[in-house]
Every structure is written in structure tokens, then in C-alpha cells.
């Protein structure tokens, strides 16, 4: 093969590699629930609490934490229904007075086809019932 032929082959290979890179990037997104979710929960429009939820699909189950850091609350159990993309998870954490109580969160994912999809529904901490809305970052 002459120099011109070798250069054309190299150019074709480079073009193929760079044209396939976006396909690999899209394929790496993973499970629709996996990722960092940021938003708030609370009772009414003025009593809101900022919340960060980290969710991960392990291939067998959804795991995660609420408000990661030194006082993170691990999610004990989580289920997702792919027919309507509803999610339920439970945890054990402190209420407003610091007493350990059950946390129960139920929501439905919106904008499934977008990267910054939202999850919204009910957020219960002990006897306190509220709502939440979080967006994947």
C-alpha cells in the first residue's frame, strides 16, 4: 500500500472511532433511577427541606442514601415498577426532634426520556406527611 492509501485508511479509522464515541456515551447512562437527585420535601409551600438522594441500580436492586455525608440515611429497601416508573423506598432516620422514625417515600418519575428527569410524590417521616420533588443531576 502506498502512502496515500495508508493515509486514507488511517483517516477512515479515525472517522469511525470519533463517530462511534457518542453512541458509547449514551449507552453508559445506566438505569433511569441511578444518579444524584436534588430537590426538596416538606409540608406546604413554605415548610421545605432541601434533600439530596443518591440512587444506584446494582443489577439486582436499587440502593442508595438520603443526604450523603456524615449523617447520611441509608435506604433500607427500594422497589421500582417499570410499567409506570413509580418508586418506593424506606429508611430509618431522625424526625425534626431527632427521634428515629420510619421514612417512607413514594413517587413517580416524569420526563423519563430526558437526562434531568424528575421524581415527585409523597414523603413521610414518622407521622409527618408531606410531598417532594427531586431532579436528577
Where do the protein language model's features map onto the residues?
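Central antiparallel beta-sheet cores of small beta-barrel/beta-sandwich binding domains
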Residues: 28-137
Amino acid at each position: 500500500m502506498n502512502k496515500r492509501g495508508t493515509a486514507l485508511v488511517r483517516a477512515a479509522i479515525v472517522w469511525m472511532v470519533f463517530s462511534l464515541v457518542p453512541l458509547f456515551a449514551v449507552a453508559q447512562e445506566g438505569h433511569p433511577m441511578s444518579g444524584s437527585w436534588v430537590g426538596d420535601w416538606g409540608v406546604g409551600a413554605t415548610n421545605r427541606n432541601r434533600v439530596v438522594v443518591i440512587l444506584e441500580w446494582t443489577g439486582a436492586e436499587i440502593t442508595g442514601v438520603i443526604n450523603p455525608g456524615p449523617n447520611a440515611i441509608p435506604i433500607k429497601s427500594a422497589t421500582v415498577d417499570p410499567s409506570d416508573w413509580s418508586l418506593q423506598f424506606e429508611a430509618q432516620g431522625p424526625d425534626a426532634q431527632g427521634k428515629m422514625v420510619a421514612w417512607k417515600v413514594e413517587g413517580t418519575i416524569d420526563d423519563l426520556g430526558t437526562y434531568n428527569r424528575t421524581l415527585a410524590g409523597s414523603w413521610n417521616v414518622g407521622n409527618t406527611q408531606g410531598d417532594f420533588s427531586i431532579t436528577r443531576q
